[in-house]
């Protein structure tokens, strides 16, 4: 595992346990790389010193990261490469979540702030065998509040609630993935350009 503590202690663009931004953490990871959990174990405190030994040691460094827009992009990325990271709006009723599929209360509970989570999968509850997709669709997220919270640290969150994280999820890319994405983009640009070219007009002479 990679060191979450390094992001808390060494990423000066964020504020450790007092909060920060996902893109700042990802930029640090791309620019500096991350040490292993063994080198810099998780202490869960912002006061833990940034270990120079680990900062200078061998790092795992991705090539880049990208933003995923919408349900299909998120699901496609999870299927192909694994979990993605995002931030979600948190309301007071989410703090006491225990089980089931979380849906924000109708009485509009108090907004508590934004919180970074990991999206690890999705599912459907109460769907029939004939129409399995007609049930209650949800995301499976991994939280950072310990195993005593929710479903051993995880939660099922209803799809389409506009809790922000479906709009701005992030994926980390290896060099190969970056090249594949670049080539795919260039192919699409060329196809779009070719489609806009006027058809050849035959010479009438």
Walk through the language-model features, giving the residues of each:
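Catalytic-core signature of thiol
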Residues: 1-205
């Amino acid at each position: 595992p990679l060191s979450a503590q390094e992001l808390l202690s060494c990423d000066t663009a964020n504020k450790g346990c007092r909060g920060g931004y996902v893109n700042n953490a990802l930029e640090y990871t791309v620019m500096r790389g991350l040490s292993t959990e063994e080198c810099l174990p998780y202490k869960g405190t912002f006061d833990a010193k940034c270990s120079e030994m680990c900062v200078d040691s061998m790092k795992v460094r991705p090539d880049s990261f990208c933003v995923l827009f919408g349900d299909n992009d998120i699901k496609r990325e999870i299927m192909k490469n694994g979990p993605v990271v995002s931030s979600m709006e948190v309301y007071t009723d989410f703090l006491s979540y225990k089980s089931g599929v979380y849906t924000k209360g109708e009485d509009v509970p108090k907004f508590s702030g934004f919180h970074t989570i990991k999206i690890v999968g999705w599912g459907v509850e109460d769907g029939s065998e004939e129409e399995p997709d007609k049930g209650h669709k949800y995301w499976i997220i991994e939280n950072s509040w310990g195993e005593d919270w929710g479903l051993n640290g995880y939660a099922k969150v209803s799809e389409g609630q506009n809790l922000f994280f479906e709009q701005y999820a992030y994926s980390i890319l290896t060099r190969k993935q970056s090249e594949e994405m670049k080539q795919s983009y260039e192919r699409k640009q060329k196809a779009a350009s070719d489609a806009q070219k006027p058809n050849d007009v035959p010479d009438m002479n």
